[in-house]
Amino acid sequence: MEKDIKLVEQIATFKRLPKSDSRWCVAFYYIAKEFWDLEEVFVIIDKTLYEEQGLKIPVFREYKEAEGFQIFSSYIKAKEFVEKQGDLFVTASGEKLIGRIRQGAFREVFVPFFAEQNFNYLLNEDEALFADTFKRLLAVMEASENYIVDQEQEDLLKAGDVQGFFADICKKYIVLM
């Protein structure tokens, strides 16, 4: 919870800086660092894919001029987002489609894979919203671009089945709350 609060504070500081201010680089670094250091992140699961195919695929959405995977720094923020959306991310049985990704899987599988695919992320929402690229997150954190895969995932990648690989990592590493 403390890391989530620090992250929100860093985003607020970043948003107050004028574009001509050189301190934005430092503020950006601290946002990336706090995000990278979260023990877990939360994603909203696409309801249609979950109900029709049993897939736990995170929501890819648009916000103003940014598009990316919607990620939350705390369960509370994800839950508030889901509740604001009505039934859009709630199953008929009342299950909120919120998934958790642990730090290891996020850092070592999702971020490098998303960076390779040139995806962006939308972190949190409203006043705490921060949008950026997974590539820049990797670069700022000086992290490896390689991602850890098991044999099944390696076979999917060798066969060129990127969608199958993505579905597999989501199935294995996203836990519904």
Please report, for each region that a protein language model flagged, where it lies by residue.
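An interfacial alpha-helical scaffold signature
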Residues: 1-177
